[in-house]
Amino acid sequence: MNLNSIPAFQDNYIWVLTNDEGRCVIVDPGEAAPVLKAIAEHKWMPEAIFLTHHHHDHVGGVKELLQHFPQMTVYGPAETQDKGATHLVDDGDTIRVLGEKFTLFATPGHTLGHVCYFSHPYLFCGDTLFSGGCGRLFEGTPSQMYQSLMKINSLPDDTLICCAHEYTLANIKFALSILPHDSFINEYYRKVKELRVKKQMTLPVILKNERKINLFLRTEDIDLINEINKETILQQPEARFAWLRSKKDTF
């Protein structure tokens, strides 16, 4: 399998997974034009679309793509049924696409129906986890999002996190505002800044590395706990997550 990315809008990535024959699955096509261009350039043969949630920048291109490739199956949670999904999926489902088995995880938080698609090593996580951050809570609760992130955090170390936005630099600046002396975060900041100066993407990321630099995955880390304790004593990791998320919302 080969992983490809298509830039869209200001900071979205549309992921395309292809096999050796050029058959492909398209993840969260927020707009059709760049996808159609890439399909023509690479002579890909689309078989399916994966939708993680209902927001327009993830589903806006579905109906136009179906006009060009009506044979495609569009997988998505119930909240995407009116956005073009033809095959509804839910937590624990498994589907077979391009000869590979994908497992579905419900990851409520950003939206209530958000799902992720996993076929080792690829995780298509939409707007649940970003490098150095996580999605805003538009519909779900901090507790729901925390549990969703813990599902992702339990995956194998070499999982490739394929998130949908280039938010890494801003996220790492936030992380440094909380833990300014953290060596892993500082090293990652230098790397990410260099990539972005060259207009290169920072994704995908490896889960093992993400655990070191993403504060939202470090809610039981003693350095972070000590920093939070300077402002408030929070005994539960979920409460520390909620504190972090509120800080990020106003950063």
From Swiss-Prot:
Q: How is the cofactor bound?
A: Binds 2 Zn(2+) ions per subunit.
**The entry's keywords:** Hydrolase, Metal-binding, Zinc
Q: Identify the metabolic or biological route this protein is part of.
A: Secondary metabolite metabolism; methylglyoxal degradation; (R)-lactate from methylglyoxal: step 2/2
Q: Which cofactor does it need?
A: Zn(2+)
User: Which EC main class describes this enzyme?
Assistant: hydrolase
Name the residues that bind Zn(2+) 2: D57, H58, D127, H165
Residues binding Zn(2+) 1: H53, H55, H110, D127
Listed HAMAP family: Glyoxalase_2 (MF_01374)
What function does this protein fulfil?
Thiolesterase that catalyzes the hydrolysis of S-D-lactoyl-glutathione to form glutathione and D-lactic acid.
* Family as reported in the entry's similarity comment: Belongs to the metallo-beta-lactamase superfamily. Glyoxalase II family.
Q: What's the protein name?
A: Hydroxyacylglutathione hydrolase
Q: Which gene encodes it?
A: gloB
